[in-house]
Amino acid sequence: MMRIKLFKYKANKFDMELDKIHYDEVAKLQANLSDEELKVQVATNGIQKFQKVVFDYYYECIGKNINSKMDVLELGAGMGRHSGVILDTGANLTVNDISASSLEVLKRTYPDIKNMVVSSMDQVPIEAKSYDVIVSCGSLSYADPNILDREIFRLLRNGGSLIILDSLNHNPIYKLNRVFKYFIKRRSKSSVKRIPDLDRIDRLSKYFNKSDIKFFGTYFWMITILGFFIGQDLANKTNILLEKYFPSSKNAFKFVLVCNEFNGHQE
């Protein structure tokens, strides 16, 4: 039996409650919108153009790795911005979030989703080995890394897959932006500290026979500035070319990780 050894990290339940309160408040504001208004706030609608390439690739990975015969869990689904892409595969989708208010908004947008679980991502009240694929978009930092990784491995069936889009924590410019969000109370201190790093990616990947990672956003920080001089459309095209021909993990902002053929076992 393979043993999973995870790094030490002290959880902060108070911060988790702060995050829940924040997203409950955001969801309650969204709940005032009409159904038509909610339905246009999905996928990449409203996302900055230079970031769309990341989400387009994430959606492509979902389409390639999920089919209608699979049971899929989306961790930290929030109000369902990206849930529709999974639903379109025909898979049996379960969505999870700590904010009940967020899932209520999601239900209005996607009434066909029947399985909703209100809980922390690191304590999902579901039987072990229930899912063929686990998906997460931008939510890894909202739970203790030790417990969350164990929970992912507990819930995933042998041979299963993991698809993650998230941010990286080693670019100083992006770090500064997250610290600013902490001071204006848009993020908790723990969620800033727990942004994934390359070591976290390695720990998640090692229990799968196959894994593939693609980095994005090395040049995001300069695109807005560049847009003032050459126009935003040309700046976006420049970003796409730079990402294509000069990809780099060193200063990347985001990553998409796809792991297949889970072979690990929880202790």
Each language-model region and where it sits:
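Short alpha-helix
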Residues: V192-N209, I213
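Class I SAM-dependent methyltransferase SAM/SAH-binding core
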Residues: M79-Q123
